Amino acid sequence: MSFRKVVRQSKFRHVFGQPVKNDQCYEDIRVSRVTWDSTFCAVNPKFLAVIVEASGGGAFMVLPLNKTGRIDKAYPTVCGHTGPVLDIDWCPHNDEVIASGSEDCTVMVWQIPENGLTSPLTEPVVVLEGHTKRVGIITWHPTARNVLLSAGCDNVVLIWNVGTAEELYRLDSLHPDLIYNVSWNHNGSLFCTACKDKSVRIIDPRRGTLVAEREKAHEGARPMRAIFLADGKVFTAGFSRMSERQLALWDPENFEEPMALQELDSSNGALLPFYDPDTSVVYVCGKGDSSIRYFEITDEPPYIHFLNTFTSKEPQRGMGSMPKRGLEVSKCEIARFYKLHERKCEPIVMTVPRKSDLFQDDLYPDTAGPDAALEAEDWVSGQDADPILISLREAYVPSKQRDLKVSRRNVLSDSKPAGYSRSGVSTATAITDIPSGNLAGSGEAGKLEEVMHGLRALRVLVKEQGERISRLEEHLGRMENGDT
């Protein structure tokens, strides 16, 4: 009997990570050294925020995404806290609003100017006071406007209406020990927590009740994290009794045994999982690691499918993840991370290689947009709503090569096209839009014909190479599946 090796088919098998060039990094940022298992970084389509070292209090830096290169030491910061900042989170419904939690026991919400900071920001829009110990966790409600959750080292979870500075719910009896992280579910009707007592809990915040609990989800003593997936399952990252790092997938309807359990390695850095509900891919970053592992979650055993690992030389001190609406879809970018080094932030782009330069519908289903589905009052009254979805097709920008291929302009015409301007010719259409008399400044038709002949030959060559690559990929697929 012969056994054939079956390779699981997945459009994400060949996802690869690539750091940007040095001039696209953010240099000379003094990343916070505070001892706390937070990401220290938050990013949205407009701004990058990084918790930084600050004397006499806590601060974080907010940079427009295009503010790359070396950051001046005098660059203004958000510096209203009197103790170190532990966590920050951008509002999903307003790209200029960010919340922060600090060792000074307060939560502050800030309005960032549209074009970024020109002077230090010391006055928050609102200060939320209710915790008696440091606040280490901040997370906005995914669909209800102005609803913010905070969790502190007093083992208390508070839910606020930021618009009125009102404390909506206080959950102070569900956690006997330090809360490691909090994650809302898809529509914000529930959230899950990972706690120092090794339990994962699913909580209904409006009822103040425990919906489900799994004790000793991971038996190790080091910090673990739990996140909700789009289908209601829970993904956890923690440590075994022998201090090996583990990943697990749970069904809250049956919390007795994990659906899947994978051991990674014996490193001691806390694992930070980032989940993309559109692709069902989980990216796992370890604090102090120099790698990002990524896994696809499916309904088929073994449920957690390893895809690949991005590896670099420098360890990461924190990590931020760009929302899907901030990605470059024309480059088949499915994720972008902002890796914190000791003194810089380095974007890392995750790309699915595709030959076609058309919009890739299968990679970019409709995704959560910036509009809130509910007001805070609606959510408090018991309403739930899924995120309002938007299409990323409008963000698609055809590549220069595609512009060239679809051009139908008569390049041999001596007349200038309507609206022609020498200074306004774009790179994408420069070859086809410039009249023949201006091509080399000489008016020689022979040179123009030579250029056009070269273009036609190049197109034929590209087509032949594409067909050859397709045949090789098909042959390789048959070999992997044992058909040859």
Curated annotation (Swiss-Prot):
Main location: cytoplasm
SMART domains: DUF1899, DUF1900, WD40
One GO BP: protein localization to cell leading edge
Post-translational changes noted in the entry: Phosphorylation on Ser-2 regulates the interaction with the Arp2/3 complex and cell motility in fibroblasts. Phosphorylation does not seem to affect subcellular location.
Localisation per UniProt entry: Cytoplasm, Cytoskeleton; Cytoplasm, Cytoskeleton, Stress fiber
Function: Regulates leading edge dynamics and cell motility in fibroblasts. May be involved in cytokinesis and signal transduction.
Coiled coil: 447-481
Segments annotated as WD repeats: 80-120, 130-170, 174-213, 217-260, 265-305
Keyword RNA-binding: no
KW Ribonucleoprotein (keyword) present: no
InterPro entries: Coronin (IPR015505), DUF1899 (IPR015048), WD40/YVTN_repeat-like_dom_sf (IPR015943), WD40_repeat_CS (IPR019775), WD40_repeat_dom_sf (IPR036322), WD40_rpt (IPR001680)
Modification Phosphoserine, positions: 2
PANTHER family per the UniProt record, alphabetical: CORONIN, CORONIN-1B
Entry similarity comment: Belongs to the WD repeat coronin family.
A GO term from the CC aspect: glutamatergic synapse
Keywords, ordered alphabetically: Actin-binding, Coiled coil, Cytoplasm, Cytoskeleton, Phosphoprotein, Repeat, WD repeat
PROSITE patterns: WD_REPEATS_1 (PS00678), WD_REPEATS_2 (PS50082), WD_REPEATS_REGION (PS50294)
Gene Ontology molecular-function annotations: actin filament binding; Arp2/3 complex binding; cytoskeletal protein binding; identical protein binding; protein-containing complex binding
Oligomer status and interactors: Forms homooligomers, but does not form complexes with the other coronins. Interacts with Arp2/3 complex components, including ACTR2, ARPC1B and ARPC2. Binds actin.
Entry protein name: Coronin-1B
Pfam families (UniProt xref): DUF1899, WD40, WD40_4
